[in-house]
C-alpha cells in the first residue's frame, strides 16, 4: 500500500493546521491506547484527542453498537427530532449519571462541539438574568467562536477574533497571583464596590481544572466560595466540563469532589464516547425558558454519537470504573512527583488532577523538548499553558497497567536524555 505524501498537507491544507506539525507522521490505525502510522510505527497515546477519547480508540462495545445501528439503516441525521437513539441516551444519562448524583438538570443539544455548548450557556444566562456581562477567569479556555472566545484568556487565540471581545470581565483564577492570596477577595470587592466599574454579571464561567491554560486545578475551598458568591449576588455558575468532565479528573463531573452544584454545565468531547461529535448543555429546570427553536443548529442531533454515548455510559453503571481511574491517577501522580524530585534540573512543579496532569517547567522551552523527544520514542502528548511551559499527560481512562507503565517510562527516558545531553534551554 502506497504511503501518503506529507506534501499533500503542506500544499493543500491551510496554514492553520496545528497538531500535524507537532506529530509529523501520517496516522492510519488506532486501538485502545495505541496508534500506528503508515510506516507501521506504534505510538502510545497520552493525548486522547485533547480529551475526546477518554475511552480510548475504537472501543469494541461502542464500535459494535454503532456498526449494528448503521447496518440496520438507523437514522443518521434528524435535527432535533425525536429518535430512538436520542431517547435511549436521555434515559440512560438520567438513570446512570444524574439520578445517582441527585442532580436535576434539563438536557439541551446545542450542536456538535464544545464551543456550541459554551455559546448556548452564555446565551441562556443572559436571557434568564437580563444582564449582559460575564465573569471569566485568567487562563481559561472555552472555545474559538466569538462568544466562547470572549471568555477565553489566551491572547494569541483572542487576536484571531478580529473584533473587540466585549461584555466580559476577567478575574484571577485560583493561585494566579500566589498560593497565599485568595483571588476571590479581589473578585468580591469588585462586586461590592459601586465604584469598581464592574456590573453584576449574568454568570461566572470556569473550568475546575484548566486544560489548555496550564493544567491549573482550583482548590476545593476556592470552588465552594465561588458558588457562595454566585448565590449571594444571583449570578449563574457555569462549569465548563468539556475537557475536565466524563471522568478525566477522577469522577464523572469534575466538580463532584467539591460538593458544588452548578446552575449550568457544559459537556462535549468524550460525552460521545467514541470520538464522534456531540455536545450537551445541562441546566436547572427553572432556567429552561427557551422558546421552541430559539436556539437551534443543523447538527445538534448526532444519532451515531447517541448510540456510542449510550454504550459508553455502561462504564458508569457501578463504581468500579471510577475506582480504577482513581487508583491509576495515584500511580501517575506518584510518578510525576518522583520525576520532579529526581531531576531538579527541570525546575518542575506537578500540576492537575486525576488523568488531567502534567509538569510545569521553569526552564524555557523544556516542555516542548520533552514532547518532541517522547514523540520520537513513540509517545504522543502535548504542551499546555500560556507559554507552553507544561507537558501534559492525558492517557485514555481505559489504559491498562502495562500501557501506563510503558508511557510513563518513555517520559522519564525523554527527560533523562535531555538532561544528560544538556538539552535544556538555560535561562
From Swiss-Prot:
**Keyword DNA-binding listed:** no
GO biological process: any one? ectoine biosynthetic process
Swiss-Prot/TrEMBL cofactor(s): pyridoxal 5'-phosphate
| E.C. numbers | 2.6.1.76
Q: Which family does it belong to?
A: Belongs to the class-III pyridoxal-phosphate-dependent aminotransferase family.
Say which domain of life the source belongs to.
Bacteria
Q: Which organism is it from?
A: Halalkalibacterium halodurans (strain ATCC BAA-125 / DSM 18197 / FERM 7344 / JCM 9153 / C-125)
GO molecular function per UniProt = diaminobutyrate-2-oxoglutarate transaminase activity; diaminobutyrate-pyruvate transaminase activity; pyridoxal phosphate binding
Specify the pathway.
Answer: Amine and polyamine biosynthesis; ectoine biosynthesis; L-ectoine from L-aspartate 4-semialdehyde: step 1/3
Q: Which Pfam families match?
A: Aminotran_3
Residues modified as N6-(pyridoxal phosphate)lysine are 269
Q: Could you tell me what this protein is called?
A: Diaminobutyrate--2-oxoglutarate transaminase
Does the entry feature the keyword Transferase, yes or no? Answer: yes
Keyword field: Aminotransferase, Pyridoxal phosphate, Transferase
Q: Which residues form a coiled coil?
A: none
Annotated Gene3D superfamilies: Aspartate Aminotransferase, domain 1, Type I PLP-dependent aspartate aminotransferase-like (Major domain)
